[in-house]
Structures are given as structure tokens and as C-alpha cells.
Amino acid sequence: MEYEYPIDLDWSNEEMILVINFFNHVEKYYESGVTAGDFMDAYKRFKEIVPAKAEEKQIFNTFEKSSGYNSYKAVQDVKTHSEEQRVTAKK
């Protein structure tokens, strides 16, 4: 699937990589599954770059329009699992 990641050009290269890494974890959550601990680590790094809820919501909406993947729902679901547990949107 081809789509663009929501990137702020004011971010450093490292910050862009960390944001893309988080969205890669969202993709894995929907496509094949991801370990809850790994997903939450990527989300925590994302939050260091995007601490404001309003900006997070805007970025999540942009990503969902591009990819069809709801990052908010993924985060909420993963939060309910233990770190070692493998989580997927596929039931």
C-alpha cells in the first residue's frame, strides 16, 4: 500500500524516523500484529515529539485519511494488553 506519512518539516531527521517508526507499528497492528510493549515504546517516543493532544489528533487524522488505519483506536486497544502480549486488529 502506498501512502504518505504525516511529517512536519520542522522535525529533525531523527524525529521523522521516530514518527514513521510509530506509524509502522500502527500498520503492523492492523496487518499482522505487534507486541504491545514494542508498540507502546514507539508511541512514547512519538509523544516526545508530538506532546500536544490537538497536534496528535491532527496527525492521526491525516494518517487515517491516507492509510485507512485509525491510530487512536490502535493505541487504546494496545494499552489494554500486557507488554509481552501480541496484539492485532484482526480478531
Swiss-Prot record:
Q: Which SUPFAM superfamilies match?
A: BH2638-like
Q: Which domain of life is it from?
A: Bacteria
* Annotated Gene3D superfamilies: BH2638-like (1.10.220.80)
Pfam families reported in the protein's UniProt record: UPF0223 (PF05256)
The family database entries (InterPro entries) matched by this protein are listed as:
BH2638-like_sf (IPR023324), UPF0223 (IPR007920)
Q: Which residues form a coiled coil?
A: none
Q: What family, per the record? A: Belongs to the UPF0223 family.
- Name the HAMAP family on file: UPF0223
What is the protein name for this chain? Answer: UPF0223 protein SAR1071
Species, as recorded: Staphylococcus aureus (strain MRSA252)
Taxonomic lineage of the native organism: Bacteria, Bacillati, Bacillota, Bacilli, Bacillales
